[in-house]
């Protein structure tokens, strides 16, 4: 086993400054907290908002497809859907052609809450974008998309 040629403290500082994983995780948590705060008054969190937004389409998604859209595993997606289902915001039904497949449907109550949530999202999004003044948001979006697609 070889020893590190860089002292640990120096390596830790370098990683702290340069590690994309660490920096993106920190930024994600900070942004997530801001959206959680924005949605709190309507009883949602940012993950639930993301689920509802992804279900707002003409045809219901399968649980597997929803998980893929959110870059989550199927089990975590199912777990995160349960509170929304209990609140009557989504329905999970067996597919008509294949009983092994489950489809997720946004209910009218879910659609109504989502409409309200979009207003809260808009305020939070504008606040976050304002905090990034001077940054090139288009480049940030492009870089994040490139990371997501790699």
Language-model segments: which ranges?
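C-terminal ligand-sensing/allosteric alpha-helical core of TetR-family HTH transcriptional regulators
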Residues: 16-23, 27-34, 109, 120, ...
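Short coil/turn segments at secondary-structure junctions
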Residues: 8-19, 108, 112, 124
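C-terminal regulatory/oligomerization modules of transcriptional regulators
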Residues: 1-16, 130, 134-150
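N-terminal helix-turn-helix DNA-binding core of bacterial DNA-binding proteins
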Residues: 15, 22-25, 29-76, 82, ...
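Surface-exposed charged/polar residues within alpha-helices that form helix-capping/stabilizing sites
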Residues: 37, 53-54, 112, 130, ...
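Short secondary-structure boundary/capping segments
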Residues: 12, 16, 68, 94-96
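Charged, amphipathic alpha-helical coiled-coil/dimerization segments
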Residues: 32, 60, 82-142
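Short hydrophobic/aromatic-rich motifs at helix boundaries and adjacent loops
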Residues: 4-10, 20-23, 34-36, 53, ...
């Amino acid at each position: 086993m070889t020893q590190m040629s860089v002292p640990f403290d120096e390596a830790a500082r370098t990683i702290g400054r340069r590690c994309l994983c660490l920096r993106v995780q920190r930024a994600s948590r900070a942004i997530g907290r801001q959206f959680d705060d924005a949605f709190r008054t309507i009883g949602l969190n940012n993950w639930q908002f993301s689920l509802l937004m992804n279900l707002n389409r003409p045809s219901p998604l399968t649980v597997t497809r929803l998980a893929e859209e959110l870059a989550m595993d199927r089990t975590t997606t199912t777990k995160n859907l349960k509170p929304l289902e209990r609140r009557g915001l989504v329905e999970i039904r067996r597919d008509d052609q294949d009983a092994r497949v489950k489809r997720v449907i946004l209910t009218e109550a879910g659609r109504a809450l989502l409409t309200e949530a979009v207003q809260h999202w808009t305020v939070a999004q504008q606040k976050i974008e304002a905090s990034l003044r001077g940054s090139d948001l288009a480049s940030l979006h492009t870089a994040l998309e490139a990371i997501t697609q790699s």
